[in-house]
């Protein structure tokens, strides 16, 4: 009986010793192997917007008078028939895209295109379904919510052109951003 107690005691002591060594190793490993998030690099979106306004067949919109702390993170204009950055299929129409990060680190996207509005709306809204009415770019349009309920979009159409403001945000935040949109030029 005494031998069993001694053997069990040795096993317990060995497990405690292993735990004492293992926990600091795990903590040190976690501390030194974390990859910090890369800093957000602001971009100058105005030249892209000016080019889009000069070449697109629709009225190009962009935000004006955004409060301090907003950072542009994406600006792209792809003329119809040209491949997007990184190759791939050519854009079906003139496509303008802007992305901004708010001071609260929330991403707002502005997308415009003048061809195949149904396919464009489906892609940008993440296969969203209509969810009432809202305003985008000074125009009344439709609200869309993605299948998973996470992404909301405001869609305004003018003929074959579509303007979409989207983000993983409440409609009120999207409408506030959309209210800053004005024609470029």
Predicted ranges, named:
Residues 129-185:
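A short, solvent-exposed beta-edge/loop patch
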Residues 43-149:
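Short, solvent-exposed recognition patches
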Residues 1-73:
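Charge-rich, low-complexity N-terminal segments
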Residues 11-21, 28-29, 66, 98-100, ...:
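Generic hydrophobic secondary-structure signal
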């Amino acid at each position: 009986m005494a031998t069993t107690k001694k053997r069990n005691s040795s096993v317990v002591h060995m497990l405690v010793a292993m735990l004492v060594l293992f926990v600091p190793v795990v903590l040190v490993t976690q501390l030194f192997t974390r990859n910090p998030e890369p800093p957000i690099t602001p971009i100058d979106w105005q030249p892209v917007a000016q080019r889009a306004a000069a070449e697109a067949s629709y009225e190009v919109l962009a935000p004006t008078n955004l409060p301090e702390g907003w950072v542009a993170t994406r600006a792209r204009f792809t003329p119809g028939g040209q491949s997007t950055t990184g190759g791939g299929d050519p854009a079906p129409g003139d496509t303008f895209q802007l992305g901004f990060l708010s001071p609260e680190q929330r991403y707002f996207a502005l997308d415009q295109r003048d061809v195949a509005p149904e396919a464009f709306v489906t892609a940008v809204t993440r296969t969203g379904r209509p969810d009432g009415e809202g305003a985008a770019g000074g125009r009344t349009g439709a609200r869309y919510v993605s299948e998973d309920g996470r992404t909301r979009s405001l869609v305004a159409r003018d003929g074959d052109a579509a303007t979409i403001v989207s983000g993983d945000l409440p409609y009120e935040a999207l409408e506030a951003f959309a209210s800053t949109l004005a024609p470029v030029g």
